Amino acid sequence: FDGSLLSFEENIKETKKIASICHQFGMGIEGELGHVGIAANGDEKDESIYTDPLDAERFAKETGVDCLAIAVGTAHGEYPKGLIPHINFQRIREVKEATNNMPIALHGGSGSGDENILKAVEAGINKVNMVTDVLVSMREYTRKRLEENPKIGYINLMMEVEENVKSFIERWIDLTGSCGKAALFKPVDRVGLLTPKCAIGLGE
């Protein structure tokens, strides 16, 4: 749940409410504190929207979120060509310590480059969002194949794009040390969640 544009108190209130519902259904929830802006606007340079470690400590305790997305110098979307954001790795470490080593997420990871992402993971980031990089990879591969063969069939092209993006994602999984971690995730009994008891609990 992204309540980062709300006031701090409202963010806590709304995130806590949603966390309570999610936990009744055996679901995890990610909250967001500090605003991850838009790359095209240059928002990544605005340190005033970075996550404050003391705020993060209180937010984590009062909301009960399972993961916290923080703002440390990245932004959503595609950066201008040649621009690589400056990530505040020390802030990551400070938030990690303040929240008692809880899982933390980095939004706007696209365009940050291998070195930045690896340093962020080393500093304590557990999850990286980078859908823009995935979409750009698909776009550029599509452009390349259409230049090579303008008459390529649409279905064949999409199948090629899918295989190409799989390789792109697999590379990032390996690079960040995420490979072989599926056993850490537990399946949710969705049949059990549909019992009347759970439905009543949701409405309380």
Place the predicted regions along the sequence by residue.
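Glycine-rich phosphate/pyrophosphate-binding loops
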Residues: 133
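Extended, intrinsically disordered, low-complexity segments
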Residues: 144-204
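Alpha/beta enzyme core
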Residues: 1-102, 114-125, 136, 140-143, ...
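Short acidic/histidine-rich active-site segments
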Residues: 108-112, 130
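Active-site neighborhood of phospho(di)ester-bond hydrolases with catalytic His/Asp-centered motifs
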Residues: 104-106
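Generic structural hydrophobic/aromatic packing signal, biased to beta-strands
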Residues: 128-130, 172
